[in-house]
Amino acid sequence: MLSWARNSAIYRLSKRMHTEKQLRQAITRKAREKFEDIGDRQVEALAAFAVKFGYDNSALDDQAYAEVATRSAQRSGRSKRAISQRLVIKGIDRETASEAVADVNDLRAAVVLARKRAFGPFRRVELDQKRKAKELASFARAGFSSEIGRQVFEMHRDDAELVLSEDVA
């Protein structure tokens, strides 16, 4: 069974990055499916072995996962708040998540979101009250403060392009 746990960990970690929580859940789920008469203690032992194997081979690193996921999410237009929340859901502790999102530029991320959704400076249609409410609500749902949302909403296209052209950390 330990060789199965090792091979399963190798397979999963070679496909994509995982957090400790994700690997533990995947091994637990698959062990219950594969070994019908396995007990809870054995399942936990297999999961712990797989996690230890991942750490021992430097294939499992929550800090690195948090940094990569943060950069990707920022490029996608996600707010600092949304990124942090998503990391915690994935199993990253709050302190590590806070460190990972410390350098996120919410203004830049909001401009990326505006470009993706054709809001604010990238708007292609005439602005009316309904559209204004929709755009501002969208920024709020994405986790941006009302100040950031309003700033991007009122921004000129040239200013938005300038924000986007600035280097990302």
Predicted stretch roles:
Residues 1-169:
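An alpha-helical, amphipathic repeat domain used for nucleic-acid recognition
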